């Protein structure tokens, strides 16, 4: 994405995720500064968007000496109009770039939150699977020897064992991140 090969990405080595290209230089520094926390990343993003909004407001305001010089030369043919058109085109381009950066940061925050949720869900499923495997191996009939020399009068050894415990349940966690994801994607967890 940043035009550099994956091996030469500065600052992106610690942030590279399996199967994803390295982050661009600007975003990798931002992610390193935040320690990888999407909440911190969102806070930094909101600060940056406020700064960009202030800069775009300042760019829209006429700057004193240049504006005055342009109005003094308004009598000449096409000379002053070109810089004004060029300045307005640059200002529009700058505004569009700021909007795209804000959209990129918003999407990055959403993707990072989604990535964290997927990782949490995978770990939860792995833990649940491990517990179920362990539970089934402890309570399966194959764990006892098939007829350990018992006569027909004796009870099988599993009759004296307590009944199987209820199936394991995973507690549902609902925090602000989960609620934010549900609202953002309208899915139920």
Curated annotation (Swiss-Prot):
Pfam families reported for this sequence: LURAP (PF14854)
GO BP annotation list: establishment of cell polarity; negative regulation of SMAD protein signal transduction; negative regulation of transforming growth factor beta receptor signaling pathway; positive regulation of cell migration
Region annotation Disordered: where it falls in the sequence: 54-82, 136-175
Keywords, alphabetical: Cell projection, Cytoplasm, Leucine-rich repeat, Phosphoprotein, Receptor, Repeat
Tissues in which the protein is found: Widely expressed. Expressed in the early postnatal brain.
GO MF, one example: transcription corepressor binding
Composition bias type Pro residues, residue spans: 159-169
Biased composition (Low complexity): 68-79
Residues where Phosphoserine is found: 28, 188
InterPro entries for this protein: LURA1/LRA25
Top-level division of the source organism's lineage: Eukaryota
The UniProt record lists the keyword Cell membrane: no
Tagged with keyword Repeat: yes
One GO cellular component term noted in the UniProt record for this chain: cell surface
Reported function: Negatively regulates TGF-beta-induced signaling; in cooperation with SKI prevents the translocation of SMAD2 from the nucleus to the cytoplasm in response to TGF-beta. Acts as an adapter that mediates the specific recognition of LIMK1 by CDC42BPA and CDC42BPB in the lamellipodia. LRAP25-mediated CDC42BPA/CDC42BPB targeting to LIMK1 and the lamellipodium results in LIMK1 activation and the subsequent phosphorylation of CFL1 which is important for lamellipodial F-actin regulation.
Subunit record text: Interacts with SKI. Interacts (via LRR repeat) with CDC42BPA (via AGC-kinase C-terminal domain), CDC42BPB (via AGC-kinase C-terminal domain) and LIMK1 (via LIM zinc-binding domains). Forms a tripartite complex with CDC42BPA, CDC42BPB and LIMK1.
PANTHER family: LEUCINE REPEAT ADAPTER PROTEIN 25
Family label: Belongs to the FAM89 family.
Name of the featured protein: Leucine repeat adapter protein 25
Origin species: Mus musculus (Mouse)
Gene this chain is encoded by: Fam89b
